[in-house]
Regions:
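Hydrophobic packing positions in regular secondary-structure scaffolds
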Residues: 1-291
Length: 291
């Protein structure tokens, strides 16, 4: 993928979200050096720390030694810790998870997006990762194990198994009611599209959330959905998935099992960005829901 495609991807995201790029700054008055050759430490209170954005907390942690990082995170809930680890460097992730009791580490992994949890576990030795997987709830464990089967540089390696779907034969009203009451849909933090599946979980089409909420309630979804969406298979290289996201101005692309057409997950635009953009560029992009 050529360098100008990276820039197009960044521009596409900013245009789609209609957001201006902002730089998040941590005031230096909240950070102090203990001694000449000591690491940085925070003066900000624990209460204030937990109210900060996960990405900002992660930026702070990356500049602290692992011992201080672990101490700062003691008062975090499992969900807060998971959100922060998703934004942290692999080194911080490994240090924090290693410092937790295995049962709590598994609870934190359950709160993370499956693709993020899979990336974290892939960096651990087999014995440690297997121990944590065995402690996770069955459904979460299955999702993560599925992702770990795919090469790290493939679409399957960066996809998430959390996406909003409805039966293809639904009306608009039935689809909206399903999304309001379905627990899996409530867990989807990246609901820009709704995927229409048949009883065999094969993809029949896709409809944007905007089109869904503005369509007449009594009409069949078949009158509104795109029955020929852009898709990738789990072994499609990450860079190709990112190129498709940029080319077609997509917020996500479905990952399909090529032989059965069963829908496995989605590659979201933020994961596509993480794949191809240099770190310095990523930090200038707006934050996404679930990112």
């Amino acid at each position: 993928m050529k360098r100008y495609d990276y820039l197009n991807l960044a521009k596409s995201v900013a245009r789609l979200l209609k957001k201006r790029w902002k730089t998040h700054v941590i005031p230096w008055e909240d950070v102090a050096s203990i001694e000449h050759d000591d690491p940085l430490r925070l003066k900000v209170s624990q209460d204030r720390l937990v109210q900060m954005e996960p990405a900002d907390i992660a930026s702070i942690l990356d500049d602290l030694d692992h011992h201080t990082s672990k101490a700062l995170l003691q008062g975090f809930t499992d969900e807060q810790l998971a959100d922060t680890l998703e934004e942290s460097s692999p080194e911080v992730q490994q240090a924090v998870i290693a410092a937790l009791q295995p049962e709590r580490a598994a609870d934190v992994l359950e709160e993370m997006d499956p693709d993020e949890a899979a990336d974290l576990l892939a960096d651990m030795d087999d014995q440690a990762s297997e121990q944590l997987l065995n402690l996770m709830e069955d459904e979460d464990e299955e999702d993560v194990r599925t992702l770990l089967r795919y090469p790290e540089d493939s679409s399957g390696g960066i996809m998430t198994t959390e996406f909003a779907s409805v039966p293809a034969e639904f009306t608009v009203e039935q689809a909206l009611q399903h999304l309001r009451t379905n627990e899996d849909a409530k867990d989807d933090e990246f609901m820009y599209y709704v995927y229409l599946l048949d009883k065999n979980e094969t993809l029949q089409g896709v409809i944007s959330l905007r089109d869904l909420v503005t369509a007449p309630l009594h009409q069949e979804l078949s009158n509104w959905f795109d029955d020929d969406p852009v898709v990738v298979n789990p072994l499609t290289p990450q860079e190709e998935a990112a190129y498709l996201v940029a080319k077609y101005n997509l917020m996500a692309v479905p990952v399909i099992e090529p032989e059965s057409n069963v829908m496995l997950g989605i590659v979201t635009v933020d994961d596509a960005i993480d794949t191809v953009l240099p770190t310095a560029w990523k930090k200038k992009l707006p934050r996404f829901a679930g990112r």
